[in-house]
């Protein structure tokens, strides 16, 4: 009889779902090189490219969003749900799945339902402080529930507890966390050389993700003169938003302060502007303070790296991003400011003062590190593999 393990992982749509999934998949492969690992996703999410690039097989189904109001989509939901669940059953059968691992999102829900109907053990990971509908469904049947937060609002079945394991980190961030723990100064110097910044001076990194954060961009750029009195700046604006930021910086501090990133730009001005940085781990390696949104992935990565941050939650939905940042703020690992309050006056009144107090920044960083978790991918992978050998319940 073959001892090959058969694992199916589910999730996708956004990088927030795909990256943790791939982090766990990579560790499973390291622990079980001969394992058959497949991923269920959609043909339209980021997983379409990222999963095959990572060397894993992608099986696609259609998104089946849960209906939230009585409309045409709600009427069509039962038939679509039945069809996609049947597709998933076929996928699980073909791959001889011994365990299913879901990371939330529309893709996960029919996978949970199909696995439950087939008696296949289920593990789930919830990255947000407030769980989504798919994982709330899966939690009813799961044998193992890992989460980035202690109380994400899941109701497990009897005998199962929600375990705060942290967020499985992208390989680049996991490597950086290890390097910082080993030698923070050397890691900072090496990264600074690649970016063209001075490793011996404070650095603020502003990022709103790949799409940017317009209000954050404007408030910070309009305060450039005040920030540059205390630190260098790397401002990652988001696609198509760098021209406006450069204009605002020029008004605040003059064109001469503007610069670009890279080893050939060492003599540039101290306010470096770019739409995006592929190797954001390099910026994190040099940073003394981050100004950012508070998506679950961002918060988990920054705390894993021990980086103090000013979190400006995206003002949408039910305030999910605020819930993500709150535990870190409670642990004194950073500050949180409402988007509407994050104005140029707020920046000028608070950020220079913080930059002028390295002891406070250091305390924030130490508290962030203490709150952060760096081994989530390993813990999840081992717990998933253990479910295969566990007697059926």
Curated annotation (Swiss-Prot):
One of its GO terms (cellular component) is plasma membrane. It is an enzyme of class 2 (transferase). The keyword Cell cycle applies. Keywords: Cell cycle, Cell division, Cell membrane, Cell shape, Cell wall biogenesis/degradation, Glycosyltransferase, Membrane, Peptidoglycan synthesis, Transferase. It holds the Pfam family Glyco_transf_28. Pathway: Cell wall biogenesis; peptidoglycan biosynthesis. One of its GO terms (biological process) is carbohydrate metabolic process. HAMAP family: MurG. Belongs to the glycosyltransferase 28 family. MurG subfamily. Cell wall formation. Catalyzes the transfer of a GlcNAc subunit on undecaprenyl-pyrophosphoryl-MurNAc-pentapeptide (lipid intermediate I) to form undecaprenyl-pyrophosphoryl-MurNAc-(pentapeptide)GlcNAc (lipid intermediate II). This is UDP-N-acetylglucosamine--N-acetylmuramyl-(pentapeptide) pyrophosphoryl-undecaprenol N-acetylglucosamine transferase. The lineage of its organism: Bacteria, Bacillati, Actinomycetota, Actinomycetes, Bifidobacteriales.
């Amino acid at each position: 009889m073959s001892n090959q393990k058969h694992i199916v992982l589910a999730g996708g749509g956004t990088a927030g779902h795909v990256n943790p999934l791939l982090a766990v998949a990579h560790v499973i492969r390291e622990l079980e090189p001969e394992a058959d690992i497949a991923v269920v996703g959609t043909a339209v999410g980021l997983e379409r490219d990222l999963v095959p690039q990572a060397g894993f097989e992608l099986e696609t189904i259609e998104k089946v969003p849960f209906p939230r109001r009585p409309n045409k989509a709600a009427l069509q939901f039962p038939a679509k749900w039945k069809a996609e669940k049947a597709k998933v059953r076929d996928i699980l059968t073909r791959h001889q799945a011994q365990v299913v691992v879901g990371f939330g999102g529309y893709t996960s829900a029919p996978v949970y339902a199909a696995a439950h109907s087939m008696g296949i053990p289920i593990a789930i990971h919830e990255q947000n402080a407030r769980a989504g509908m798919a994982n709330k469904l899966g939690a009813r049947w799961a044998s193992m529930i890992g989460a980035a937060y202690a109380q994400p609002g899941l109701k497990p079945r009897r005998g199962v507890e929600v375990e705060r394991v942290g967020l499985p980190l992208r390989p680049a961030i996991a490597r950086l966390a290890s390097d910082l723990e080993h030698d923070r100064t050397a890691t900072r110097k090496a990264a600074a050389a690649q970016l063209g910044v001075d490793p011996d001076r404070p650095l603020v990194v502003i990022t709103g993700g790949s799409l940017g954060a317009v209000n954050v961009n404007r408030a910070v750029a309009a305060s450039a003169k005040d920030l540059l009195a205390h630190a260098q700046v790397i401002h990652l604006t988001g696609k198509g938003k760098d021209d406006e930021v450069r204009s605002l910086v020029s008004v605040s501090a003059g064109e001469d302060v503007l610069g670009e990133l890279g080893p050939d730009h060492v003599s540039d001005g101290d306010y470096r502007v770019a739409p995006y940085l592929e190797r954001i781990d390099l910026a994190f390696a040099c940073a003394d303070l981050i100004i950012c949104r508070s998506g679950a992935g961002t918060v988990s990565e920054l705390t894993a790296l021990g980086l103090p941050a000013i979190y400006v939650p995206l003002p949408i939905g039910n305030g999910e991003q605020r819930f993500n940042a709150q535990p870190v703020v409670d642990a004194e690992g950073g500050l949180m400011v409402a988007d509407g309050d994050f104005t140029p006056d707020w920046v000028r009144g608070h950020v220079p003062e913080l930059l002028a107090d390295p002891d406070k920044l250091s305390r924030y960083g130490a508290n962030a590190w203490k709150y952060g978790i760096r081994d989530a991918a390993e813990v999840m992978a081992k717990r998933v593999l253990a479910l295969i050998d566990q007697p059926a319940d």
